[in-house]
Each structure stands twice: as structure tokens, then as C-alpha cells.
Amino acid sequence: MKIRLLLALAGSALGFAVLILAGLPTASRAAEAPATASAGEMVPGFNHQGLERLHEGLRAFVDSGQYAGTVSLLLREGQVADAYAYGMRDLENKLPMGRDTICRLYSLSKIVSTVAALTLVEQGKLDLGDPVENYLPQLANRQVMVGGTADAPKLQPASHPFTLRELMTHTAGFIYGGSPAAISEVWERAHLWDSKSLSEFVDRLAPLPLVHDPGTTFEYSVSIDVLGAVVEKVSGQPFEQVLRERIFEPLGMKDTGFSVEPAKRDRLAKTYKPGADGRLVEAAPLIGVVPEGTGAWPGAGLFSTIDDFARFAQMLCDNGTANGHRILSRKTVDLMMANQLYELPLKYNTFRPNNQADGFGLGGEVRIEAGGDRLGSVGDYGWYSAATGFCKVNRKEKLVALCFTEHFTGKAQPLDWHFVRVFANLYNQALE
């Protein structure tokens, strides 16, 4: 599929309309921006009324003052079916959100990093069943914290060395935070995010206990950052160079990386959260994800535009190929999008509480049941951003759905699951 033809920019033959919104009250500052919307009815497979409902739903989040801005993109059979940008990327300077707005991907970076590792698997340089200690010996002889306190932890040896597959499925036993207080305190003392490199990160991680025995429990974690360190070690290249050579350059992703060039920083979106009075205030980036770049964090550090990320997502939808380049084989994409948690009890089988419709593949969530709390299809694959970003690839429907908002909830869980559910329901109900 010729991606350069699929992702024509606003103002191209798709005939984008620009709606200038004036006279809005101060409380709706974000909605003063122009909205751009594509002619969705030109692409088969969507109904125009459904797309209008999608736009109305996105506008409601901005007009109510909950969000500064949103940008969404739907691809069907490799064509842009709908693109909609509304509100601001920068409230203070009244700069509008658009398809060329650069956003922090946060955990959407994990899918990209997983693909990079899988290219090495295909070359025979890695195997999913390999113990990670084969490549990072400082992570050998893991201990699991089963009780005690941060100062006097009760430990027992892990039953087996965790594997690359367990890294990709967040079942290696690592954490991010929010786990039992004692082990979270132990981890916080390591100041992992002060590391200046992935090798330093692994060295800081090495003495920390696991929270679960490997392979027994899904626990969202730093696993993909460890995976990135493996990729660096095996490839002999800096992680960002691996991504650039194996993914970004073949796909034409010119606005994606772990930093933002000075000449492009005027396109960078600010991230917002509700302030004490409920009005939006600028939020500090998580783990030092700043445009100057503080390191290549495989699990959360990438910047990108929605068009750039659509090139990546469309590659997955097209079974690993794009622009005449094969990034992954079809069967590897099949494996990536298959539920890998089938051996675990159901309560350990999902990322979101009380959600039994989704399992987890390699690097991302996969829909395994038609039920659940939102519309979708069995086989949907994708992930989310802490800044309430959304990516789903549906190969059966030949559909890619993306939305970036750069919004934190201001709570311990920065991702707004309510928005995720609303967006998923609205774009799915627009399908014919």
C-alpha cells in the first residue's frame, strides 16, 4: 500500500473544510481554534451521519472546557476516511491542534519498540523464549518480594528467569508503581528515571525485587524499557538508531523520534490537566519526556504526529508491509496480535479492571471477546497513551483508528478511560 498516497495532508484532494469558530466564551478557550474535517463520505465503509456524531462527540470534550484539543484520523482500506482536528495544542498562545501537531506518544511508544525487537527475532538474533539474562547478565538470579517492608523485604527466588516474551506481555514481574506500598517504595528509591542511558537504567533495576513470579501475572511495567536495552545490546546500535533504520526511514516517519528538532518545536502540543478550580492548566511531562530529549525511553519516550503514527499503524494493518518495504512478516504480525495470556486465570488476563473482552498480545492489547464496555471487533489490536492517546488496528475491517489529545486526568491514572470508551464507540458506530 502506498502510504504517501494514503496520508495526503489537509488541503489536498480530500477537500478539507475549515470552520472558523468565533465569539465563544472564555471558558471554552480551546474551542476558539478552527476545526478541520475531511469529507468522510468519499471513502466507502463509513456513514456520514456516524462521522458527524464522532465530530460532535469530540467537540463536546473541548467546548465543555474538559480538553484543550483533539486530533483524530480514521483509515479504511488504506485511505483516509476521516480526519478531524478541533481545539488548541497551545491554549496560552492560541495555536490550533492539527495533523502536523507533534505529540508525546508515551506508552504508544511500546508498540513501536516491540516491533523493533521482533525484527531481530525474525533475523534469528533473538528468540521469544530466551531468558533475558542471556543478554543482560546483571538481571540474573531474580528475587520476588513476597512480604516484609521496604527496609526489610521478605524475598524468595523466582521460579525461572524471565523471558523476552514475558517482557513483551508485561508478565516478567516488574512494576511501574501503584503496586503494594512496600515494593513501590523499594523501586522509588532506585530513581530509575534519572538514568542517562538504558544501560544505566538496567544497572539501577538489577538489585530491585520482582512483584510477581515471572509468567504468573500481568503487571503493567517497565518491561519494554528492559526490552529496549536488549535490542541495544544485540544490535550493537543506540536504540533510536535501530528505530530510525528499521521503522522510521522505511515508513517515511520524518516527525518521529525521542526528541524534537528546534525548528519543529513550534508544532509541539502542550499537555493539559484540570487545575484546582477545574480549568485546564499546563501539565509537566512524565519521566522527563521533553523536546530536548533526555534519553531513548522505549516504553514512553517517542514524539510523533498523527500522520506519522498512522504510517506505522497502517503497516501493521497491511500485515507488516508499507511502501514496498516489509518491516515484519505476516505471521509475526499474526503472533503479535494474538492473545498471549491464555494460560493465566481470567482476573490476570486483562489490563483494565473488570474488562474480560481484552487480552494482551506482544506489546499491545488485543480484543478476544465481542462483549465488554465498548464497541469493537475481535482481533482489534493497539494501545494507549498516558496523555489519553488511542491507537487501534483492525485487520478484519481494514481499519486504523487514532486519536491524540495530550490530556491528563490529573489523577493517579493519567489516562482518561471515559474518553477512550466514547471515542471507540463513536468511530465504530460510524462503520457501515
What role is predicted for each listed range?
Residues 1-4:
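Positively charged n-region of N-terminal signal peptides that target proteins for export
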Residues 10-23:
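Bacterial N-terminal signal peptides
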Residues 20-34:
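Signal peptide processing junction and immediate N-terminal pro/mature segment
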Residues 33-42:
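Acidic/histidine-rich, surface-exposed loop or edge segments in extracytoplasmic proteins
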Residues 42-105, 125-127, 141-148, 285, ...:
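Short, conserved catalytic-motif segment at the N-terminal edge
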Residues 52-59, 78, 102-132, 140, ...:
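Active-site SXXK
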Residues 90, 142-378:
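Short, surface-exposed loop or secondary-structure junction motifs
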Residues 382-432:
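Structured C-terminal helix/loop/strand segments within mature extracytoplasmic catalytic/sensor domains
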